[in-house]
Every structure is written in structure tokens, then in C-alpha cells.
A protein has these predicted regions:
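Active-site catalytic loop in hydrolytic enzyme cores
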Residues: 1-57, 70-79, 147-149
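Short, solvent-exposed coil/turn elements at secondary-structure transition points
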Residues: 2-5, 98, 117, 136
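Short, surface-exposed linear segments at secondary-structure transitions and domain or protein termini
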Residues: 5-11, 130-141
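Short, functionally important structural connectors and interaction interfaces within domains
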Residues: 13, 22, 37, 116, ...
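Short, well-ordered beta-strand micro-motif
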Residues: 29-31, 113, 132-134
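CN hydrolase (nitrilase-like) catalytic-core segments centered on the catalytic cysteine
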Residues: 36, 45-131
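A short C-terminal boundary segment appended to hydrolase-like catalytic domains
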Residues: 138-160
Length: 160
């Protein structure tokens, strides 16, 4: 986890991860028999540069265990997964806890898989469930060939 979730939403939720956690200092990309995969945690998905770093490091998929709350979940959950998938032409997989209205922190839920075209392949609701979806890495390659966003980047123009 590189980015700590410290928020105070007016008429919404207050939460400060920095009270108990220390942020990481690098992106995590690892080798598997299917290719490289990345992992980011929850709030990290809100930083496009972090997903881009993983994609440029060769990640074919990024796994995101996350627990968006009842304020940010409805507004941003699906949107951020679709945007990171589309921006990087990569599969994004979000795993979220089921909603428990009796808990101190109430999660939005809605585990999700998005494809490199930015399409939601499958999404659960707020209840307990298991999300199973077949990932086609050849489709990722085809999308990157047809619309070569990463190759067309002009990194010399960007101030990151």
C-alpha cells in the first residue's frame, strides 16, 4: 500500500489510515506462469501513475483488494476500475468485502473484473459471493495492437 487513505468528507466519512499504517515506497509487480501481475491496495487505484508504472513494468493484470466506503463506493468504485483498465489496456480485478451494516466500517462491496477495453466483465453486488471470470490475455494483446496507446505515449511531454 503506497497511498494512505486520510479523508474527511463533509457530511460523510472521516478516516485516517496514517494513524495506524505506514505507506510503501514502490509498486509491486511479480512473475507468474501467466505473465507479470501487479498488486495495489484500495486507495492506490486512485493514482493513475501507479497503475501506469505497473503496466510499463509489464503487468498483464492488477489485483486490488479494496474496501471503498458507502460515500466513495457508489460514486467511484466502477469508474476507477474501468479507467485504470482502459488507460493501461490491462485487466483490473477488485476484491471487496461484503457489506456488513453492523460493522464500524461499512464497505461498498461489489467485487469487479474489468477488461483492457474498460468494460466491466463481471461485478458482484454488496452481498457475500465468489467472482469467477475467465481472463483472455490474447484479447489484451489484440486490443494493444489495434489501439496502441502505450506505444503512442509521448513521455517527453508529460511532467510526472
Amino acid at each position: 500500500k503506497a497511498h494512505l487513505f486520510d479523508i474527511n468528507v463533509k457530511n460523510g466519512q472521516y478516516f485516517k489510515e496514517s494513524d495506524t499504517l505506514t505507506s510503501g515506497d514502490h509498486a509491486t509487480v511479480f512473475d507468474t506462469e501467466f505473465g507479470k501481475m501487479g498488486v495495489m491496495i484500495c486507495y492506490d487505484i486512485r493514482f493513475p501513475e501507479f497503475a501506469r508504472t505497473m503496466a510499463l513494468d509489464g503487468a498483464r493484470m492488477i489485483f486490488v483488494p479494496a474496501a471503498f466506503n458507502m460515500t466513495t463506493g457508489p460514486a467511484h468504485w466502477e469508474l476507477t476500475f474501468r479507467a485504470r483498465a482502459l488507460d493501461n489496456q490491462i485487466y483490473m480485478l477488485g476484491c471487496a468485502p461484503a457489506r456488513d451494516t453492523q460493522a464500524g466500517y461499512i464497505s461498498w462491496g461489489h467485487s469487479i473484473v474489468t477488461d483492457p477495453w474498460g468494460k466491466v466483465m463481471k461485478q458482484l453486488d454488496e452481498k457475500e459471493g465468489i467472482l469467477i471470470e475467465e481472463i483472455d490475455l490474447d484479447r489484451e494483446d489484440q486490443i494493444r495492437e489495434q489501439l496502441p496507446l502505450l506505444k503512442h505515449r509521448k513521455s517527453e511531454m508529460y511532467h510526472l
